[in-house]
Amino acid sequence: MSRYRGPRLKKIRRLGALPGLTNKSPRAIRDLRNNSRSEYRIRLEEKQKLRFHYGLTEKQLINYVQIARKAKGSTGKVLLQLLEMRLDNILFRLGMASTIXAARQLVNHRHVLVNGRLVNRPSYRCKPHDIIMPKNTTKSGVLVQNSLELFTGKELANHLNLFSTPYKGLVNKIVDTNWIGLKINELLVVEYYSRQA
């Protein structure tokens, strides 16, 4: 299954606010069909929220769930930590891109350096003490600067630091799952995939 490129507002109306997909918010509409939601539908919607927010394909999400199952700790929390430490998501959280899709494009077009090395994989897993900055070209700097001007006034994640003089971000530590700005029940996502197996 490929990455979703269709109308974003339809997904937001269906699943609720997804800040990684778009910065628009859904209208407050009462869903009359909510009363008859099955358990399967609830689990599926939680999985779809996660998938569309982070811009993943179904196969990528399955791979992340398998990695999270093998790791120590709660599978749901480890899954969210893995997704939050992706390079495209870190750029979005730092404010260097307005959405995760815009951050993915920055990385794919080779505008981002991690620890002084060019990285063009949006799924690159950042580690604590990684330094993320735009490439030393005017085009890269302008793209990041425009996004940061829109980001002013928003709260920065507690696991990240942003330095404005040469525009660089620092990953302090692994993300705390309580901070994630997405209303999601990660256990339902893990349950969805455990029932599929």
Curated annotation (Swiss-Prot):
GO molecular function annotations of the record: rRNA binding; structural constituent of ribosome
Domain S4 RNA-binding positions: 85-161
Keyword rRNA-binding: yes
Keywords, in A-Z order: Plastid, Ribonucleoprotein, Ribosomal protein, RNA-binding, rRNA-binding
Coiled-coil regions listed: none
Taxonomic superkingdom: Eukaryota
Family statement: Belongs to the universal ribosomal protein uS4 family.
PANTHER family: 30S 40S RIBOSOMAL PROTEIN, SMALL RIBOSOMAL SUBUNIT PROTEIN US4M
Function of the molecule: One of the primary rRNA binding proteins, it binds directly to 16S rRNA where it nucleates assembly of the body of the 30S subunit. With S5 and S12 plays an important role in translational accuracy.
Descriptive protein name: Small ribosomal subunit protein uS4c
